[in-house]
C-alpha cells in the first residue's frame, strides 16, 4: 500500500500538460490558463519536481465526461469552434456559452486536459498508488450538468468524485475559492455519499448561491455545508473557523477520501476577489486537511492576479511535499511577472475585515448545530467495483519516446499571448462575473428537474453504463496514457 502512516512525508503525484498554457479565453478575459504554466515553471525552478512523480494527464473522452454531463452538452462542446459559432447560436444560448464562457480555439481539448488530470488523480488514489494527487488545471467548480458557468465548462471535480465513489463510501469536498462551489454542491445535493463544504463570499456576488441555510435535500439533508463570508477576511479570522469546522466535519462524517479545491481568488489583491488572505494563510487550509492523513486530491480553481496564483499553488505544492522553500524566488521563465520584490510571499492589504469575531462565531455555531444532526458515519452498501476510468496500462511511461517527454519542458517556454501579462495585472472591468451574472446563479429548480438522472449516475456504482451510444468517442489506449515525465 502506498498510503503513509501517521504524520510522515506523503507520496505525491502531480499532473501537468505542457500545452495547457497555450489555451486563451480571449483578450480582456480574466481567466488565463497561462497561470498554470507559470506555476509549473516556478515549482520546477524550486526543484520540487525531484520530490514527486510528474504525469502528463490523458485527454478525458466524451464518454468519461458524460458520466455526469448530458450527452447533448458534451456533443456541443466537441463541435463548437470560433469559425462555426453562427451555426450554433441557439445551442450557445441554451448552454450558456458566449460571454463569461467564450468559445476559443481548442476549447474541448482544454476541457479534456483539465478533466483528465483530475480523473487520473482519483484513479491513482483509488489504486492506493499515491497519498496525494495534484492537478492545478482542475477545480472548475461552476460547470453544471448541461451548462457552462463562471469560466467553467466541464466539472472535473464532480467527475473525479464519481471516480472516488467507486472505492470510497464517503467523499468530502472542501472549497476555499472565493466563489461558492455551486456546481459541485448541486451535483451531490441529494446524496449522503458526498459532503460539500464551501467557504466563500456571499451576497451580491457570483454565483449568488451558498446561503447558510442551503443544507442539502432528501438523503443529502445536512450534507451541504456553507460558510458565507464578508469582504476583507484575513488569515487570522479564516484560520479560527476553518480548522474547527473541518475537524467537526471529519468527526461526524468520517470520509475515506478528500477533494480540496484551492481557488486562489481568495488571496489579497485578486483581480476579481475581495478577501485579504496571504499565501501562507491560504496554504494553512492545505496543512489542516493534510493532518487527517486521508487520500487527498488537490485541485486549482479561480485566481485572476496570475503572479499570485503561481506563488500560491507553488507554495501549496511544497506544503503537500513537506518541503520548505525560500521566500526569494528562483530565476524562472516568467521572472519579470513577480516584480518589484521577486518574493514568494505576499503581504495583506489594509482593507477592512468586515467579518467580526461575533459574526464568525455565530455562523460557526450554526454550522455545528447542523452537523450535530448528522448520524455518525452513514452506512453505505458497497457494490461491485466498475472499471477504472484510466486503464491499468496508462501508467506505462517507458514506451514513450524520451524526446517526446522532453519536448513538454520545451513547450513551456512558448511565448504567451501579448495580452496575458498586461490584462492580468490591471483591475479593468474584470468584475463582470460578479456583477452581471450573480442573478444567474440561483438555479435550484434544476436540482429537482435533473434529480433522478443525476442520482442514477452518481449513486449507482454497480457497473458502468453499458447502454451508452457506441458511436461516441472511443477511449484509445494511446490517448489515455498517463505518461510520467522523467525529465520534467
Swiss-Prot record:
Transmembrane segments: none
Binding site for 1D-myo-inositol 1,4,5,6-tetrakisphosphate: 28, 32, 271
One BP annotation, GO: dendrite development
This protein's record includes keyword Cell membrane: no
Cross-link (Glycyl lysine isopeptide (Lys-Gly) (interchain with G-Cter in SUMO2)): 75, 439, 452, 458, 462, 478, 481
Binding site for Zn(2+): 177, 179, 265
Assembly, per entry: Part of the core histone deacetylase (HDAC) complex composed of HDAC1, HDAC2, RBBP4 and RBBP7, the core complex associates with SIN3, SAP18 and SAP30 to form the SIN3 HDAC complex. Component of the nucleosome remodeling and deacetylase (NuRD) repressor complex, composed of core proteins MTA1, MTA2, MTA3, RBBP4, RBBP7, HDAC1, HDAC2, MBD2, MBD3, and peripherally associated proteins CDK2AP1, CDK2AP2, GATAD2A, GATAD2B, CHD3, CHD4 and CHD5.
Protein's name in the database: Histone deacetylase 2
Organism, scientific name: Homo sapiens
Gene name of this polypeptide: HDAC2
Amino acid at each position: 500500500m502506498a498510503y503513509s502512516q501517521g504524520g510522515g512525508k506523503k507520496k505525491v503525484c502531480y499532473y501537468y500538460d505542457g500545452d495547457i498554457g497555450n489555451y486563451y479565453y480571449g483578450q480582456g478575459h480574466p481567466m488565463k490558463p497561462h497561470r498554470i504554466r507559470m506555476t509549473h515553471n516556478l515549482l520546477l525552478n524550486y526543484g520540487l519536481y525531484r520530490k514527486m512523480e510528474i504525469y502528463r494527464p490523458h485527454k478525458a473522452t466524451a464518454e468519461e465526461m458524460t458520466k455526469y454531463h448530458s450527452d447533448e452538452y458534451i456533443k456541443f462542446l466537441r463541435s463548437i469552434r470560433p469559425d462555426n459559432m453562427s451555426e450554433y447560436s441557439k445551442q450557445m444560448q441554451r448552454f450558456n456559452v458566449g460571454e463569461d464562457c467564450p468559445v476559443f480555439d481548442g476549447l474541448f481539448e482544454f476541457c479534456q486536459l483539465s478533466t483528465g488530470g483530475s480523473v487520473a488523480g482519483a484513479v491513482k488514489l483509488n489504486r492506493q498508488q499515491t497519498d496525494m494527487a495534484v492537478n492545478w488545471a482542475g477545480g472548475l467548480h461552476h460547470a453544471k450538468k448541461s451548462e457552462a458557468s463562471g469560466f467553467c465548462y466541464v466539472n472535473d471535480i464532480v467527475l473525479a468524485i464519481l471516480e472516488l465513489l467507486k472505492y470510497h463510501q464517503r467523499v468530502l469536498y472542501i472549497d476555499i475559492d472565493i466563489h461558492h462551489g455551486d456546481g459541485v454542491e448541486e451535483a451531490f445535493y441529494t446524496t449522503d455519499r458526498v459532503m460539500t463544504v464551501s467557504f466563500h463570499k456571499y451576497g451580491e456576488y457570483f454565483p449568488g448561491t451558498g446561503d447558510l441555510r442551503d443544507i442539502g435535500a432528501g438523503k443529502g439533508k445536512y450534507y451541504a455545508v456553507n460558510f458565507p463570508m464578508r469582504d476583507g477576511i484575513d488569515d487570522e479570522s479564516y484560520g479560527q473557523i476553518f480548522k474547527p469546522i473541518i475537524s467537526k466535519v471529519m468527526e461526524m462524517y468520517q470520509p475515506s477520501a478528500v477533494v480540496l479545491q484551492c481557488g486562489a481568488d481568495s488571496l489579497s489583491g485578486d483581480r476579481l476577489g475581495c478577501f485579504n488572505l496571504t499565501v501562507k494563510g491560504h496554504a494553512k487550509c492545505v496543512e489542516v486537511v493534510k493532518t487527517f492523513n486521508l487520500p487527498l486530491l488537490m485541485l486549482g480553481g479561480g485566481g485572476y492576479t496570475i503572479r499570485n496564483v503561481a506563488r500560491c499553488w507553488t507554495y501549496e505544492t511544497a506544503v503537500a511535499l513537506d518541503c520548505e522553500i525560500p521566500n526569494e524566488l528562483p530565476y524562472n521563465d516568467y521572472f519579470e511577472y513577480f516584480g518589484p520584490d521577486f518574493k514568494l510571499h505576499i503581504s495583506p492589504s489594509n482593507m477592512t475585515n468586515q467579518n467580526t469575531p461575533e459574526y464568525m462565531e455565530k455562523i460557526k455555531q450554526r454550522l455545528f448545530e447542523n452537523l450535530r444532526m448528522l448520524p455518525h458515519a452513514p452506512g453505505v452498501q458497497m457494490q461491485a467495483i466498475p472499471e477504472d476510468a484510466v486503464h491499468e496500462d496508462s501508467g506505462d511511461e517507458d514506451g514513450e519516446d524520451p524526446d517526446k517527454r522532453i519536448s513538454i519542458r520545451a513547450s513551456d517556454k512558448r511565448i504567451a499571448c501579448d495580452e496575458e501579462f498586461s490584462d492580468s495585472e490591471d483591475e479593468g472591468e474584470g468584475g463582470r462575473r460578479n456583477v452581471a451574472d450573480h442573478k444567474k446563479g440561483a438555479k435550484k429548480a434544476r436540482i429537482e428537474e435533473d434529480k433522478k438522472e443525476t442520482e442514477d449516475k452518481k449513486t449507482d456504482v454497480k457497473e458502468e453504463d453499458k447502454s451508452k451510444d457506441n458511436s461516441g468517442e472511443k477511449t484509445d489506449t494511446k490517448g489515455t496514457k498517463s505518461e510520467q515525465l522523467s525529465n520534467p
